[in-house]
């Protein structure tokens, strides 16, 4: 079984793929992480260290799935970050837009429209 340090390192590796520019950013840049460091350590170990590193789905696929779920749930702040991460993981702009079409069918047009507003900011409209 991996140790906490192993999971942290694996999680940091995934986060580095998704958000390379913020990998070594000071904690103060992220007020929520400064407020609740144990929570973000937990997320790094479990979400990124355990789940994102599992076999059978590539990081790019997990990223596309995550964007779709965040869009469907209306979690726009997290969606904004994960859209940028998806691009870094190799998901194309067109794939992200197509995923929002899928969201519209299964989670409703309002959920997809809200997500597309966020996507327009992240991806641009050109």
Model regions and ranges:
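Short alpha-helical scaffolding segments that buttress acidic/His motifs in well-ordered protein cores
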Residues: 43-47, 64-69, 99-104, 115
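Mid-chain, well-packed structural core segment of small domains
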Residues: 64-67, 72-97
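Substrate/cofactor-recognition hotspot
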Residues: 109-113
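Amphipathic alpha-helical interaction elements
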Residues: 53, 70-71, 88, 104, ...
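Acidic, glycine/proline-rich low-complexity segments that act as flexible tails and inter-domain linkers
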Residues: 1-59, 88, 114-126
């Amino acid at each position: 079984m991996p140790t906490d340090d192993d999971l942290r390192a694996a999680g940091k590796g995934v986060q580095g793929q998704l958000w390379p520019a913020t990998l070594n950013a000071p904690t103060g840049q992220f007020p929520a992480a400064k407020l609740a460091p144990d929570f973000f350590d937990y997320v790094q170990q479990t979400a990124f260290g355990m789940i994102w590193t599992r076999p059978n789905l590539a990081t790019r696929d997990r990223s596309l799935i995550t964007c779709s779920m965040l869009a469907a749930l209306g979690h726009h702040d997290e969606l904004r970050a994960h859209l940028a991460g998806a691009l870094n993981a190799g998901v194309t702009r067109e794939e992200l837009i197509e995923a929002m079409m899928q969201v519209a069918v299964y989670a409703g047009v309002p959920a997809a429209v809200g997500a597309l507003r966020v996507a327009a900011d992240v991806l641009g409209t050109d």
